[in-house]
């Protein structure tokens, strides 16, 4: 099995927002914080990782949701499987993360619907709409 950083290394190099195009990331964990999750089947981690392959090094904020199983329809957001047999997913697309984000911001909303902005940009933006998740 691979470490979380090894999973992130493979995944990040394929992301449109990765600044080191053509280079293999050399990631170092700066911080990893567990956030409370209202989804009993999900752990939410917010990571800061520094990429030493860039000069100067780049810092990335990476929300990750860890699960014991792969939920139906979440294959596109799959990052990898770590040494603890957890399946890692891109938090931006995961209701467990977006709910935890709102909680951290002090914005308690039940079943808040969110989506990731689909336009081309160098980051990932989450848009919160009125109403519950579809």
Show the residue positions of the predicted features:
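Conserved catalytic cores of phosphodiester-cleaving nucleases, focusing on short active-site segments
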Residues: 132-134
């Amino acid at each position: 099995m691979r470490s979380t950083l090894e999973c992130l290394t493979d995944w990040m190099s394929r992301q449109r927002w990765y600044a080191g195009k053509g280079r293999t990331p050399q990631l170092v964990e700066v911080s990893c914080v567990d956030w409370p999750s209202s989804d009993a089947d999900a752990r939410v981690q917010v990571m800061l990782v520094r990429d030493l392959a860039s000069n100067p090094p780049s810092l990335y904020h990476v929300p990750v949701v860890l699960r014991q199983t792969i939920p139906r329809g979440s294959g596109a957001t799959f990052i990898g499987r770590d040494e603890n047999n957890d399946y890692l997913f891109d938090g931006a697309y995961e209701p467990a993360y977006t709910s935890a984000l709102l909680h951290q911001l002090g914005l308690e909303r039940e079943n808040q619907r969110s989506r990731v902005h689909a336009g081309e940009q160098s980051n990932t933006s989450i848009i919160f709409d009125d109403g519950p998740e579809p």
